[in-house]
Amino acid sequence: MKAAVLAVALVFLTGCQAWEFWQQDEPQSQWDRVKDFATVYVDAVKDSGRDYVSQFESSTLGKQLNLNLLDNWDTLGSTVGRLQEQLGPVTQEFWANLEKETDWLRNEMNKDLENVKQKMQPHLDEFQEKWNEEVEAYRQKLEPLGTELHKNAKEMQRHLKVVAEEFRDRMRVNADALRAKFGLYSDQMRENLAQRLTEIKNHPTLIEYHTKASDHLKTLGEKAKPALDDLGQGLMPVLEAWKAKIMSMIDEAKKKLNA
């Protein structure tokens, strides 16, 4: 019952983000989410792209053109795979450095959130207690109405409506009171966030990290260049084969027109 009341209160008053905050004791880091999303996205593009190429080659036009796109797509896929393998350690190093350099900021923000959470918990407990009291009072008022059901259904319906409206009004008052208390902490959170942003802007670590990030990106570019050159060399035979095939088709079409 306690979990249900807290869930209703949080979703009703603060939205899904607050619910997420309460539910995730050890949320996945932002960097892990970015890396996982990129991996899933690239794999999805590769799989869906191959499906489209396969459908095109199976069509009448694809059979007439005979471009061998599927074979070339597999070649391209293996080339991109090698590129990912070569860049993997470099990007992993970049994300690790970024996470390490911003660890102090995440710790400070987590402290602020935990502090607000602890201050809000007594109000949530109070709301739960009032919720239980109102539900029990509602049940007691409904209990005698059950015996009157066989006597007068319309009269019972009227009583039910009155009791339901009274219960709704009481819970609305309790919810408004809880929302007002949460509003105070929302203002505090905004002030804390503004203060943290000011600290971040003027923090020597951030200025130092800007230089480090530039160095990391420069290193990433230098290490990625050989892999990108390899990708370009792998693509050239594919592009040349397509170009030769298309030019051959154009020449053949010209001959037929001139004949």
From Swiss-Prot:
Tissue expression as described in the entry: Major protein of plasma HDL, also found in chylomicrons.
Annotated stretches, region: 10 X approximate tandem repeats: 67-259
Record keywords, A-Z: Cholesterol metabolism, Glycoprotein, HDL, Lipid metabolism, Lipid transport, Lipoprotein, Oxidation, Palmitate, Phosphoprotein, Repeat, Secreted, Signal, Steroid metabolism, Sterol metabolism, Transport
Cellular compartments annotated: Secreted
Sequence repeat positions: 67-88, 89-110, 111-121, 122-143, 144-161, 162-183, 184-203, 204-225, 226-236, 237-259
Gene3D superfamilies per UniProt: 1.20.5.20, 6.10.140.380, Apolipoprotein
Pfam families: Apolipoprotein
PTM entry text: Glycosylated.
Protein name as annotated: Apolipoprotein A-I
Organism annotation: Rattus norvegicus
Organism placement in taxonomy: Eukaryota, Metazoa, Chordata, Craniata, Vertebrata
